[in-house]
Amino acid sequence: MSSSAVFADNAGHESPNFPLRVVDGLTLPPEYRKALRPGEEWKDATGRGRQLPRYFYEIPSWDSAMKIELASHFLLWEFIQVDVREAPPLRTFPRYVPCAITLLAVCLERFREAVGTMVHISANGGYRSPSHRFSKNATLHSWGTAGNIYRIGDTFLDNRSAIERFSLIARETLPGIWTRPYGAPSGFAEDHLHLDLGYVLSVPRDVTN
């Protein structure tokens, strides 16, 4: 049996405090591999190749997603809200999210502490697969390391003043965070605050290959 197969069989036992099973994307059924493209290269807007995540958390049900905390004030469901633009296999359960999603949750928790109020992630603004209709140019959302925030407390982020104010707080609070500038052209944002951690690949410690 290959080392990756052994890992898949034993997945879920290396993190006793976290309830989700880790899976090797290369061992998933064909329809999931086609949608997730685990470990494949995807070119960004500059033509540079970026390696897609290979290891994922398996979410068994929406009920599980509604209950599992990724951080003190963030539940898993907030990061996986998608609509019909997502690939059909990934609109039902089980669902799969890159392991790096936990890093994004920790950063958003720290950001929430800095702003002192609730932080709301947009629909289609957390994880979305490479097959999602919004996904292009190696979007960081397909790594699970980007979040689009549409509202903070009672403030909707639909104007320059609000977006730039909270963007500054994010950059001052989170070392290495990147935020989209305000504006309408591609690469800008005018109706949300985009935060991302870059192309992070999270590989579980028990992987041997």
Question: Where would I find each of the regions flagged by the language model?
Answer:
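N-terminal secretory targeting signals
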Residues: M1-Y57
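Catalytic cores and adjacent binding grooves of peptidoglycan-active enzymes
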Residues: V6-F18, A138-N209
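Active-site acidic/histidine clusters and adjacent loop/turn architecture
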Residues: E58-V115
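A broad, structure-centric signal for solvent-exposed, well-ordered loop/edge residues
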Residues: I59, M66, P130, F134, ...
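N-terminal start-of-chain detector that recognizes signal peptides
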Residues: F93-Y96, M118-N124, E164-A170
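Extended, low-complexity, intrinsically disordered C-terminal regulatory tails
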Residues: L103-K136
